[in-house]
């Protein structure tokens, strides 16, 4: 197949799959292996590389929040997790927790953990989303409290889970959003925190990939095309998802996406 068409396909997949509870890394790597015939290891490195495109999309979509976070850096040491520094504190601590768990998980478990285990974990995440959706549906009747800003426990929990999401078949967004929802954050806030957290994680993964092997499994021009497509499609799809959350009861979104996660995880496992 024409390399540019392959690049468009892979960028499209990355842009769509990044935000939903299906492993974008697994989907892009599988498509790359099937279409181009490169090794699974090279395809996985390419999938990690394409996260830079959706990181750009998240930065552009949440540009106001990113600007506010950068402006709050000076206040971080004096007032961590205050209203104006909560997002920055969350991202810094969660990113550190991701590094602490993600690097050892990659080095120790990457060769040992099978697609079966990753698929079952993704199905578990999907099941948690379904349960979360049902809890959201009956939250008012059960008088479940809501959290308005993240705290240190949220940051450590979500960061650890994001680090473990490097395992085969595990959805980063599905895992982190599920954790935030179960901690009492409302739907749009959970998406926002998860997507903001994806920016430093994706950029760090790209640095590792480029330092290790350079641009993997693809020529420079198709790589640029794939990045552009993933950024544009990622921006459009994250906007569509946020709009959906604003217009549709989030318990329904959780339930549907959780069902997708269960089905996707079982398909990987089988």
UniProtKB/Swiss-Prot annotation:
EC code: 3.6.1.27
Reactions it catalyzes: di-trans,octa-cis-undecaprenyl diphosphate + H2O = di-trans,octa-cis-undecaprenyl phosphate + phosphate + H(+)
Main location: membrane
A molecular function (GO) term: undecaprenyl-diphosphatase activity
Keywords, alphabetical: Cell membrane, Hydrolase, Membrane, Transmembrane, Transmembrane helix
Compartments it resides in: Cell membrane
Principal EC category: hydrolase
Residues annotated as transmembrane: 88-108, 115-135, 149-169, 191-211, 214-234, 250-270
Bilayer disposition of the protein: Multi-pass membrane protein
GO CC terms: plasma membrane
Cited function: Catalyzes the dephosphorylation of undecaprenyl diphosphate (UPP).
Family statement drawn from the similarity comment of this UniProt entry: Belongs to the UppP family.
Protein's UniProt name: Undecaprenyl-diphosphatase
Organism name: Haloarcula marismortui (strain ATCC 43049 / DSM 3752 / JCM 8966 / VKM B-1809)
Lineage: Archaea, Methanobacteriati, Methanobacteriota, Stenosarchaea group, Halobacteria
């Amino acid at each position: 197949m024409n390399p540019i068409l392959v690049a468009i396909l892979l960028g499209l997949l990355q842009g769509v799959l990044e935000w939903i509870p299906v492993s974008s890394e697994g989907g892009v790597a599988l498509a790359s292996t099937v279409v181009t015939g490169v090794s699974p290891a090279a395809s996985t490195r390419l999938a990690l590389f394409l996260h830079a495109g959706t990181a750009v999309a998240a930065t552009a979509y949440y540009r106001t929040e990113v600007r506010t976070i950068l402006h709050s850096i000076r206040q971080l040491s004096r007032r961590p997790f205050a209203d104006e520094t909560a997002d920055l504190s969350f991202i810094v601590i969660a990113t550190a927790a991701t590094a602490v768990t993600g690097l050892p998980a990659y080095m120790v478990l990457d060769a040992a953990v099978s697609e079966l285990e990753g698929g079952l974990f993704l199905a578990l995440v999907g099941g948690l989303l379904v349960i979360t959706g049902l809890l959201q549906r009956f939250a008012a009747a059960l008088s479940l409290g809501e959290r308005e800003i993240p705290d240190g426990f949220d940051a450590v929990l979500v960061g650890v889970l994001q680090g473990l999401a490097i395992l085969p078949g595990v959805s980063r967004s599905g895992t982190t959003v599920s954790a935030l929802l179960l901690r009492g954050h409302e739907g749009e806030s959970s998406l926002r925190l998860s997507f903001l957290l994806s920016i430093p994680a994706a950029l760090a993964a790209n640095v590792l990939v480029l330092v290790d092997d350079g641009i993997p499994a693809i020529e420079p021009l198709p790589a640029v095309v794939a990045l552009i497509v993933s950024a544009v499609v990622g921006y459009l799809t994250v906007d569509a998802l946020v709009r959906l959350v604003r217009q549709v009861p989030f318990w329904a979104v959780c339930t549907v996406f959780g069902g997708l996660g269960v089905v996707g995880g079982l398909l990987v496992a089988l």
